[in-house]
């Protein structure tokens, strides 16, 4: 699945960071002055969102700390008998000692009862504490829950629920689902029935599976030896979204059974599960559409199922629809037959064996363009008025599909492959087997309005989702702790395949950019290993972050570079062949590599140092004669030096590559493995400089001794092209990151980028703009306007020649066009080089033509932003927004509207997107991030997030990538203790699950680091800048 943001880079899908220490780029933050007076208890009762006291349904009564813990335990276990009312406490007051009375002696009966109660209570406590503890692995707890023998959760009907764990038991597995659905897109409800063929792997009496939000009307059970259906009762345990069927007979190992469940449910109004969409077509007619998004845990909301990735099965799906609608699912349509009331029922062929999260179905009005590719019918679908924008996607898909089949030496196994542009979709895209779903802006391409960046976005996301047909669909991780096996591989293949097939797009620049941003996130204490233990739904949702995607991909790039492309490819082919249609763990991947390397290198041992611990190494390099002295430690952004964790536990096996001035760069590269704290590399000759981590293929930062930094800086000034553009960008990134850590003077970082006046490549310039923009944003948001202006003037002086050479056209290579876009946006944002005048002239001509005059696509967003600075321009852009047929153009308009200096307009934009009527709610994250990037809105976004937190969580789900992005984007530019206290207080007032979210902890850490950066650098920066 592709998380989505359509910013400059893609951290799960294009994110641009604007804070000093936040990886999710485009986000924004805004906050009002915090409340200076603590709330009285009476005031808490009237909080708009409600406090945790009121959530527990206690009304005006408060509860002390022990009682709140007790109530939490009751909720956790689902035990109604543990609930206590305040009335019990009040009645107890009568037994308290009166101040002026004597203590009456209790009766013998009373003493016996009291002693008995105490003995029972102590016994229960001892049993609970003496029970064997479960040892959790990263896959979760596999020990039998012995405490369940004494304390069991309670189902909704008051009976004991026979299973207490979040993970399903493995005694029963599904073999095949027959699913029939009849959605009503007007009432937004649906009826369904699912028949599940089961097999018992162990003797049991209970069938435990997932179900949530279903009104179950009938459940029947049948064994393989009997054709008689038996109606059975179900138990529901909503807290774990589970149901239990108690079979009428023992289920015996190796025997097959059939379970049929009939139910009804609402079509979701969120972006999760089987959800509904309404939109207005060109004729202003309201249209209805329904689609699915099941990853990670939402298949259970559409039909009862074993909703864990390891429970693979086949699926036969039937959908009843209106005659004017089209229904699609994973497999080709097998038949269409008339149903009741003039409806039609489509039946789809039985699927291959797959996980529940990959099941998909869509109902709505669509048109398609198709082409056969070696027996597979490839089709791209869109709503009727946008069918003209699917040609690029179809051509791209055909080329990539052929490439993957050749590279993996495994044919795509299905007879059809559909790609569908969904009118309203939260994720960037989803890899459902045979039915890929996309946002319209990530699949559709309009030649007249789509920029080169839009083309790259569409191409890369198609490449990503197609790669999933092998990595994730054919071979699937057993549990969400190893999500990186899906997403890391798909992300790596996304860049690798585009570089192979569409070399002119220079996708390596985007991959480099993404690695830089991911490492910023991974350098925080709130980071996590890419293979991490997860259990709760919030923990699983949070695994869909830039680390699973881009760190996973970066580690694979590093491994490929170290082993060679041929060895890497052979290991991947072996891995796919050995585990087709299976569910695997990380060790299965590394075993395939070890088999190919013939154990000359223990790849498993090497790579576990990268996947099972968070963070990455800082490699310190010192050159002494012909020796390179190397040392490794964790690169850790910390609030104070003493807060850094002990370094003794951090050790990576690091592929060390380097280049020097002693050999021809294009022909010489040396690689060795640093698998201990320090080591020495012997050079073959005396050299003037050495650059470690050649082409930045390694996932680490390099720090040089002062003289070696100086030698590299001097070489860049003499002739930067001795080093590749990747290496030049890498040096810029590393020195600014080290300056942020205090290991290098900030002035030395600016000395290094002085060479930029001679730079012509995109990657180094965009990285320098990014790093200096981080500093500018902090200075501006704190009101240091003179200092921020001096910073802009210095950067402008370095890039003045390049800016003056730009034309307002779409001419040049894709890389040149992206550089033009970045330079002109920088110039216009700061009113440099007559940029505003040129953009205003273009905008006025476009507005005079009522939007019919074409604009250069690569500078379109810059022109729109300048135009939106006036009241007339803003209103005209807004009037054009709804009528635009291109999502690429609509996004450019939206970004311009959200860049206004009018806070009333900004608030209205965010509110309109949240409501979803004029601007779709899927755009809200983009709007919030854009609002917060600019000075007038940087406090407004945080206020909006606070005021609408409950609505946001309902729409996007706690822990989801969108929530991560919104939290980061509305806080990551704060750099005062006042804002730190406000953000912390707000989240402490939410649920415990919210406070524990990794994105919340990360937001607090980022604010602290911003504060630290300003304390460390502001004075010296003002002295020499």
Curated annotation (Swiss-Prot):
The record marks 549 as: Transition state stabilizer. Residues 132-1025 are extracellular. The active site is at 465 (proton acceptor). The modification N-acetylmethionine is found at residue 1. Residues 1-109 are cytoplasmic. This is Leucyl-cystinyl aminopeptidase. Residues 96-101 are annotated as: Tankyrase binding. The modification Phosphoserine is found at residues 80, 91. Substrate binds at residues 295, 428-432. It is a single-pass type II membrane protein. Keywords: Acetylation, Aminopeptidase, Cell membrane, Glycoprotein, Hydrolase, Membrane, Metal-binding, Metalloprotease, Phosphoprotein, Protease, Signal-anchor, Transmembrane, Transmembrane helix, Zinc. It catalyses: Release of an N-terminal amino acid, Cys-|-Xaa-, in which the half-cystine residue is involved in a disulfide loop, notably in oxytocin or vasopressin. Hydrolysis rates on a range of aminoacyl arylamides exceed that for the cystinyl derivative, however. Release of an N-terminal amino acid, cleave before cysteine, leucine as well as other amino acids. Degrades peptide hormones such as oxytocin, vasopressin and angiotensin III, and plays a role in maintaining homeostasis during pregnancy. May be involved in the inactivation of neuronal peptides in the brain. Cleaves Met-enkephalin and dynorphin. Binds angiotensin IV and may be the angiotensin IV receptor in the brain. Pfam families: ERAP1_C, Peptidase_M1, Peptidase_M1_N. It comes from Mus musculus. It is found in: Cell membrane; Endomembrane system. Its cofactor is Zn(2+). Zn(2+) binds at residues 464, 468, 487. Its main location: membrane. InterPro entries: Aminopeptidase_N-like_N, Aminopeptidase_N-like_N_sf, ERAP1-like_C_dom, M1_APN-typ, Peptidase_M1, Peptidase_M1_aminopeptidases, Peptidase_M1_dom, Peptidase_M4/M1_CTD_sf. The modification Phosphotyrosine is found at residue 70. Belongs to the peptidase M1 family. Binds 1 zinc ion per subunit. GO terms for cellular component: cytoplasmic vesicle membrane; endomembrane system; membrane; perinuclear region of cytoplasm; plasma membrane.
């Amino acid at each position: 699945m592709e998380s989505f943001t359509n910013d400059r880079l893609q951290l799960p899908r294009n994110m641009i960071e604007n804070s000093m220490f936040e990886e999710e780029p485009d986000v924004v933050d805004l906050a009002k002055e915090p409340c200076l007076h603590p709330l009285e208890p009476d005031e808490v009762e009237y909080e708009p969102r409600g406090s945790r006291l009121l959530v527990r349904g206690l009304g005006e009564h408060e509860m002390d700390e022990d009682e709140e813990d007790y109530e939490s335990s009751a909720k956790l276990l689902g035990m109604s008998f543990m609930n206590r009312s305040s009335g019990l406490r009040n009645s107890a007051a009568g037994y308290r000692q009166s101040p002026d009375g004597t203590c009456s002696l209790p009766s013998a009966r009373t003493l016996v009862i009291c002693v008995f109660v105490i003995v029972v209570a102590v016994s229960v406590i001892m049993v609970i504490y003496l029970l064997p503890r479960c040892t959790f692995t990263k896959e979760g707890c596999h020990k039998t829950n012995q405490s369940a023998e004494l304390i069991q959760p309670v189902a909704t009907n008051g009976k004991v629920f026979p299973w207490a764990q979040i993970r399903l038991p493995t005694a029963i597995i599904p073999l095949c689902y027959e699913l029939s659905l009849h959605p009503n897109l007007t009432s937004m409800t649906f009826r369904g029935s699912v028949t599940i063929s089961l097999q018992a792997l162990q003797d049991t009496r209970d069938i435990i599976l997932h179900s949530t939000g279903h009104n179950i009307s009938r459940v029947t059970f049948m064994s393989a030896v009997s054709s008689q259906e038996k109606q059975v009762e179900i138990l529901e345990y909503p807290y774990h979204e589970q149901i239990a069927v108690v079979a009428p007979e023992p289920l015996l190992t190796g025997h097959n059974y059939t379970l049929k469940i009939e139910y009804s449910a609402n079509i979701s109004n969120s972006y999760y599960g089987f959800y509904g969409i309404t939109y207005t077509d060109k004729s202003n007619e309201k249209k209805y559409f329904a689609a699915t998004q099941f990853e990670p845990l939402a298949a259970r909301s559409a039909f009862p199922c074993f909703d864990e990735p390891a429970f693979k099965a086949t699926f036969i799906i039937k959908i009843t629809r209106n005659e004017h609608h089209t229904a699609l699912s994973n497999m080709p349509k097998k038949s269409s037959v008339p149903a009741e009331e003039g409806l039609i029922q489509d039946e789809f062929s039985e699927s291959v064996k797959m996980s529940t999260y990959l099941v998909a179905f869509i109902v709505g009005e669509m048109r398609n363009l198709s082409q056969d590719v070696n027996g597979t019918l490839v089709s791209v679908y869109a709503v009727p008025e946008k069918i003209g924008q699917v040609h690029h996607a179809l051509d791209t898909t055909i080329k990539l599909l052929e490439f993957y089949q050749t590279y993996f030496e495994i044919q795509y196994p299905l007879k059809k492959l559909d790609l569908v542009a969904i009118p309203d979709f939260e994720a960037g895209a989803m890899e459902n087997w045979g039915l890929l779903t996309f946002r319209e802006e990530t699949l559709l391409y309009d030649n007249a309005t789509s920029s080169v960046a839009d083309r790259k976005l569409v191409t890369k996301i198609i490449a990503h989702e197609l790669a999933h047909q092998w990595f994730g669909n054919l071979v699937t991780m057993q549990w969400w702790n190893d999500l990186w096996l899906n997403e890391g591989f798909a992300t790596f293949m996304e860049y690798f395949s585009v570089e192979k097939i569409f070399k002119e797009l220079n996708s390596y620049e985007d991959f480099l950019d993404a690695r830089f941003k991911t490492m910023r996130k991974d350098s925080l204490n709130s980071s996590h290993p890419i293979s991490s233990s997860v259990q709760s739904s919030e923990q699983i949702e949070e695994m869909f972050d830039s680390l699973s995607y881009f760190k996973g991909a970066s580690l694979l790039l590093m491994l490929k570079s170290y082993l060679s492309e041929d060895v890497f490819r052979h290991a991947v082919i072996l891995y796919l062949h050995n585990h087709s249609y299976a569910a695997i763990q990380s060790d299965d991947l590394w075993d395939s590599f070890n088999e190919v390397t013939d154990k000359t290198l223990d790849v498993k041992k090497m790579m576990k140092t990268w996947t099972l611990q968070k963070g990455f190494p800082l490699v310190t390099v010192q050159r002494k004669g012909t020796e390179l002295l190397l040392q490794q430690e964790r690169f850790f952004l910390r609030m104070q030096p003493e807060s850094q964790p002990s370094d003794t536990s951090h050790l990576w096996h690091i592929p060390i590559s380097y280049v020097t001035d002693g050999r021809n760069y294009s022909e010489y590269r040396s690689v060795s493995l640093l698998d201990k704290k320090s080591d020495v590399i012997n050079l073959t000759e005396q050299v003037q400089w050495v650059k470690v981590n050649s082409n930045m293929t390694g996932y680490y930062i390099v720090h040089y001794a002062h003289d070696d930094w100086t030698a590299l800086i001097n070489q860049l000034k003499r002739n930067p092209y001795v080093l590749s553009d990747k290496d030049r960008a890498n040096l810029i990134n590393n020195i600014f990151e080290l300056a942020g850590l205090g290991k290098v003077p900030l002035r030395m970082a600016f000395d290094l980028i002085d060479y930029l006046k001679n730079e012509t490549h995109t990657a180094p310039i965009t990285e320098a703009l990014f790093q200096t923009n981080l500093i500018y944003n902090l200075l501006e948001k704190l009101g240091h306007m003179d200092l921020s202006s001096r910073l802009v003037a210095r950067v402008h002086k370095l890039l003045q020649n390049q800016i003056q050479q730009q034309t307002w056209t779409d001419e040049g290579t894709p890389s040149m066009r992206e550089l033009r876009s970045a330079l002109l946006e920088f110039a216009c944002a700061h009113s440099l080089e007559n940029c505003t005048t040129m953009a205003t002239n273009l905008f006025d001509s476009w507005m005079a033509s009522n939007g019919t005059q074409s604009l250069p696509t690569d500078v379109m967003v810059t022109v729109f932003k300048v135009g939106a600075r006036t009241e007339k321009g803003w209103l005209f852009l807004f009037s054009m927004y709804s009528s635009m047929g291109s999502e690429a153009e609509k996004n450019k308009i939206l970004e311009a509207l959200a860049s206004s200096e009018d806070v009333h307009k900004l608030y209205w934009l965010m509110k309109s997107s949240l409501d979803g009527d004029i601007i779709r709610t899927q755009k809200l994250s983009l709007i919030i991030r854009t609002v917060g990037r600019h000075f007038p809105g940087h406090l407004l976004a945080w206020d909006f997030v606070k005021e609408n937190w409950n609505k946001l969580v309902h729409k996007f789900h706690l822990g989801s990538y969108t929530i991560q992005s919104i939290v980061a984007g509305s806080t990551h530019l704060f750099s005062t203790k006042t804002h730190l206290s406000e953000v912390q207080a707000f989240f402490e007032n939410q649920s415990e699950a919210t406070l524990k979210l990794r994105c919340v902890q990360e937001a607090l850490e980022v604010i602290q680091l911003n504060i630290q950066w300003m304390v460390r650098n502001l004075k010296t920066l003002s002295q020499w800048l």
